Amino acid sequence: MALVVKGKVNINEFIDLTKMEKILPSMFTPVKSVMCSKVDKIMVHENESLSEVNLLKGVKLIDSGYVCLAGLVVTGEWNLPDNCRGGVSVCLVDKRMERADEATLGSYYTAAAKKRFQFKVVPNYAITTQDAMKNVWQVLVNIRNVKMSAGFCPLSLEFVSVCIVYRNNIKIGLREKITNVRDGGPMELTEEVVDEFMEDVPMSIRLAKFRSRTGKKSVVPKGNFSSRDRSQPNKNYGNAKDFGGMSFKKNNLIDDGSETSVAESDSF
């Protein structure tokens, strides 16, 4: 059963497009297209895992261009009875970065008693199309004090991103248009009901320890714990359907009966 069943991704929560950008043809605006990715899914089987996640699934990229990860919506569901103890910390990671504190883009903590949760991350930075084809993002998951036999799946996570795809940097930059970003370090959101152990160790330290134990390339195999359909992002050579210079593609997202929060980063 898909976790993401209804509602819509609200692009305006992440991007503030001017009226001029909506009217002008794409050749006169730095925005080539604004779109939402398809849903990528991770089934968590281990208490601590570092998994590949395709945040640009279904996004049409431009050859020799750029893609800005403007926003990310993460939905999680516990596959557990209501009275279970313990909790989880989820962290978005840029695997290109060598320093663990710079690799962590946003962290979120919640208890197993929350059957369903949802949070938003605002990475707000661009990478080249060439880097994007290498799937540079990972998810670090740390489950604590959830007593389940090995081989079963206590937690499911789904990811949908809002992206801006464009060809050149020479025109006025896009990043000052991104909303919900403020100065300061990455924010880590914590539910009051989460056990104290969740707040003791920052996720950047957990990532550094995990990398030192397993090696940076030792991540969860895609075929075992993540979705089977992990195709590379598609390249777009200029034939996307535009609406006044922008293309909009939306996925459905759950938006009722769930716990929703925002995690922010200071990347500019």
Swiss-Prot record:
> Which GO terms of the cellular component aspect does the record hold?
host cell cytoplasm; host cell plasmodesma; host cytoskeleton
List locations, semicolon-separated: Host cytoplasm, Host cytoskeleton; Host cell junction, Host plasmodesma
- GO terms for biological process, alphabetical: transport of virus in host, cell to cell
Stored InterPro entries: TMV_movement, Viral_movement
Ranges where the record places region Disordered: 217-268
Enumerate the UniProt keywords alphabetically.
Answer: Host cell junction, Host cytoplasm, Host cytoskeleton, Host-virus interaction, RNA-binding, Transport, Viral movement protein
Q: Does the keyword Membrane apply?
A: no
- Quote the biased-composition stretches of kind Polar residues, using this chain's numbering: 259-268
Quaternary state and interactors: Binds to host RBCS at the plasmodesmata; this interaction seems required for viral systemic movement. In resistant plants, interacts with host MBP2C at host microtubules; this interaction prevents virus cell to cell movement. In resistant plants, interacts with host resistance (R) protein (e.g. tomato ToMV resistance protein TM-2(2), AC Q71BG9) at the host plasma membrane; this interaction triggers host defense responses leading to programmed cell death.
| Record's function text | Transports viral genome to neighboring plant cells directly through plasmosdesmata, without any budding. The movement protein allows efficient cell to cell propagation, by bypassing the host cell wall barrier. Forms a ribonucleoprotein complex with viral RNA. Binds microtubules and modulates microtubule stability. Can bind double-stranded DNA. Triggers host hypersensitive defense reaction in incompatible plants harboring resistance (R) proteins.
* Name by which UniProt lists this protein: Movement protein
Q: Which species is this UniProt entry from? A: Tobacco mosaic virus (strain Rakkyo) (TMV-R)
Upper classification of the source organism reads: Viruses, Riboviria, Orthornavirae, Kitrinoviricota, Alsuviricetes
